[in-house]
Amino acid sequence: MQSNNSHAFRQLRFLQVYSVALSAVVALLAWQTFFHNHNGGRFREITVERVNIVEKDGTLRLVIANRERQHPGIVDGKTLPQRDRGAGLIFFNDEGDECGGFTYSGEKKTSDMGFSLDQYANDQIVQLQYEDNGQRRHYGLKMWDRSDEMPTGKLVRLHDSLKALNDTAALAATLRNLRAQGLTGQERLFIGKTDNRAVGLFIRDDRGRPRVSIGIDSGNNLIFQGYDTIGNPIQLKSNL
């Protein structure tokens, strides 16, 4: 009986030692894997839905994501509510706020693509864009002016406060007033192909009013036209 107990004890002791040794080997392998991956590694292929690139302190600098998991943007350090955005890349500045990006989407009925550069604390001021809804299509380079008096954070807070009042008329009137003052941004220049199939250079003044159009229309006719501040055509001087 004593011999059997001694044998059982030795077996139990062996299992304990084996378990400890196996745990140590697994822990060592896990540590080596962790250490290797955190000090550079090479991968032939990786499949993910989203990648966040951050600084050492955790500040977000770049997001690469599919449409479903795309970042909604950060303004004044606050993440915006989730919204529909195309797959692609979103850029963030040294302070962690969104400062541009490259997004795209497309199917048979509609497609769009845009590479945007944002003014500091404001919306886009330069964009290379393409939009197609199956019937109308335009693409080219567009530029805007943005007001320092109405940065994106301030505009978002104003919009949210008005929306909370449940007064759509007041919201619409306020936005119209801001646009009239040029506080929501004004398009200044477009170089490309328009919805009506004209290709050329189109310039607006600081109120967003069309002033100069130079290009070729859909019938291959020359466009060389100026406009006054209320939209009346004026003659441009030309040596053509």
Per-region residue spans from a language model:
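Single-pass membrane-anchoring alpha-helices
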Residues: M1-N37
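Parallel beta-helix/beta-solenoid repeats that form elongated, surface-exposed shafts/blades used
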Residues: A30-Q82, G86-L240
